[in-house]
Structure formats: C-alpha cells, structure tokens
Design a protein with these regions (language model features):
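Long, low-complexity, mixed-charge
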Residues: 1-80
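Conserved beta-strand/loop scaffold segments within soluble protein domains that form the structured core
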Residues: 63-319, 333, 337-379
Length: 379
C-alpha cells in the first residue's frame, strides 16, 4: 500500500547539523523532590533544518495521543524525521508480517510512525535501534490507536554503542476490550531514554508492559512508564527487571493512574533490580495515583545483589564470581534474542550481545535462522 511505503531517510551527517537541548523531558504525572534528580532527563540532540522540505504528516488523531517522553520530544522528532509513516490494519484482519521500525545511531536516523489497528484486528509492531559507531543519535516516535477488540503486540529491542544515544517515545490509546502487550529490551549504550504512555480509555481494556534492561560501565538508562486507566474494569500489569554493572546510572519512573470513573479497574507494577557494580546509581520512583473508590493498585521495587549462597553454589561448579554474575546478564540477552520476532530486532539484540558478552556466548543461543523475513520495514 502506498501509505505503508518507507518514508524514512537517513539524516545528514552530524557535521552538517547543529544541536538543541531538550530540557527536563520524560516527566511523570506526579513528581518528587527536585533534589533527588529523578523527575526527568535533559538531552542534547541534533537539530537539522528541514526548511523547504515537503513533509507527510500523520492524521490529526495521532497528535492527541500522549507519548511517554512528552511533547518536547514529540515536536523534536516531527521536526527531524524526513517524513512520517502511517500504517493501517483493516478491521477484523490479522496482519501476519510485523510492522517494523528500524533506526541506526550510526546514520542518525529518526522515525515518526503512526499505526491504526482497526476494530477486531491484530498486529505486531517492532522497533529496533542499533549502533556500533563512536557517536550518533537515533530516535523513534511510535503512536498507536487500538480500536475496540483489537490486539496489539509491541516489541522494542534497543541497544546502541557507548558513545551514542537513542530516544524511544511510545504512545498508545486503547478502546473497549482492546489488549496491548508491550515487551521492551533496553540493552544498553551511552544513553538510552525511553518513555511509554498507555491510555486505557475504553472499558475492559488491558495493558501488559514488560521491560528488561541491562546497563554497564558509564551507561545512562532513563525509563518513564505511564499507564492511565480511564475505562471501567481495565487491567494494567507493569513489570520491570534488569541488571546494572560497573558505574551505570538508571532512573525508572513508573506510574499507574487510576482516573476518576475507572470503577472496577486494577493495576499492578513491580520492579526487580540486580546490582553487580560498586559504583552503580539506581533510582526507582513507583507511583500509584488514585481518584476513584472501587479500584485496586499495587506497586513495589526490590534491589539487591546475587546472594552468597548462589555465588558459592556456582563457584563450586567451576565458575568464577564474575562468570556467575554474568549468567544473570546473559539471561536478559538470551530472552531478547530468542523472542525477537523478525530480522532487524534479532540483529540489534545479537550485535549488543556480542559487544557485552562476546561473539561466542552471543551465538550460543542465537536461534535466528528460522526468523520470518522483515515485514514492513522502515529503513
């Protein structure tokens, strides 16, 4: 279809671009003390003039969707993307091939994508971000409308090189009886900033969001998750888990907002953090907002290291302490590689696993030979 053609082009070289600072983006609905420095992130990103370009804009409906990194990032992506891409999944159909958004920090690619999943339809959307160079920024803005009784699966596999950064902003609006599944794999790099906002606007809508992450050395990982439960009898399940090594810095803001009128709704959020480095900085801000009586909301976070008993058990079987700890990191990458639904996301996970774990280990669980070919790619 014409409206599904690849509209994205690589950005000009960084040498031809200026920069702009996005101040205090990826804010949560309710903030904590500023002195904790957990409310937002400030990013310096390329700024390329698109003056004179003819730009295809998404339908106006998409501009009303809240996105996880906020309006400043949305405006920046729209100004930097060579074009916007619109995909529509017809009513009552099941789209077999995934809708793929693939961006590279090496090429400075920025993607603006809108997906309309019509009533009773189902689709899988994949975002893959990768990079192997010394510097560069890539970004993806994905906005999804899930109509009544639709089923949307979103898989994000994100990993760039140490001197690079990636911005990932997601916004989803779900109508009556719609189901949204989001699986995120944040596999590290210089700076990874991702925000997700899911609006359960319809009755009995459901969202399941799972995020697995790894950061090491001096990586910066910033995550903002927001689920707004507006319809009656909605369900939200949010789960984050990961490992932090060396001097990595991670901030997570996770908010479940039980809006007035969301009677009978339930929301749960939980995070588990494994700390492997002495200089790790971990900040977690789980929040439940409630403006309705007949609702249930739960949240929590646990942080710890590998127990001495587990270390002793593994060392008795011939592993060093470091090798024993790396088993937990390996499990994150194995999950990402094994569950990548197509070639671009699989490649992004393998490239990052090779960098972190080594090529031999990365390919121990590389089952990519049977992957379907690409789908509707965006690069």
């Amino acid at each position: 279809m014409a409206d599904e053609k690849n509209q994205q082009a690589a950005a000009p070289a960084a040498a031809n671009a200026g920069t702009v600072t996005l101040e205090r983006v990826s804010n949560p609905p309710a903030q904590t003390w500023n002195r904790l420095r957990a409310n937002d992130i400030t990013l310096t990103v390329p700024s390329i003039s698109r003056k004179g370009d003819v730009h295809f804009a998404l339908p106006q409906l998409f501009s009303k969707i809240e996105c996880g990194m906020g309006q400043k990032v949305t405006d920046w992506v729209c100004s930097q993307a060579a074009d916007s891409r619109y995909v529509e999944v017809p009513r009552g159909t099941r789209r077999e091939e995934p809708i793929v958004v693939s961006v590279s920090a090496d090429e400075g690619q920025v993607a603006d994508t809108g997906v309309m999943v019509r009533e009773g339809a189902s689709a899988t959307i994949v975002v893959a971000a990768s990079g192997q160079g010394q510097a560069g920024t890539c970004a993806s803005l994905l906005r999804v409308v899930a109509e009544a009784r639709s089923h949307v699966t979103i898989v994000e596999v994100l990993g760039v090189a140490e001197g690079q950064q990636h911005l990932e902003s997601l916004g989803v609006s779900a109508a009556d009886d719609a189901r949204v599944e989001v699986r995120q794999y944040a596999l590290g790099g210089g700076t990874l900033a991702l925000g997700s906002a899911i609006d359960l606007a319809g009755d009995r809508a459901r969202a399941d969001l799972t995020c697995r992450y790894h950061a090491r050395r001096k990586d910066v990982l910033d995550i903002n998750h927001v689920v707004r439960q507006r319809g009656r009898n909605t369900r939200a399940e949010v789960s984050e888990s990961g490992a932090l090594d060396d001097a990595a810095r991670k901030t997570l803001r996770a908010t479940i907002d039980l809006v007035h009128g969301a009677r009978g709704s339930k929301g749960n959020e939980a995070e588990s953090v494994l700390v492997l480095g002495d200089d790790v900085v971990n900040k977690t801000m789980p929040v439940i907002l409630c403006d309705e009586d007949d609702v249930a909301g739960n949240h929590g976070a646990t942080i710890g290291s590998v127990s001495p008993e587990q270390i002793d058990y593994l060392m008795d079987r011939g592993l060093s302490r470091r090798e024993a700890e790396q088993l937990f990191v390996r499990a994150i990458f194995e999950d990402a590689i094994m569950h990548a639904p197509e070639e671009a996301s699989h490649r992004a996970a393998v490239l990052r696993a090779e960098e972190v774990l080594g090529a031999d280990v990365a390919h121990d669980f590389d089952g990519g030979a049977g992957l379907p070919e690409g789908g509707e790619a965006a690069c």
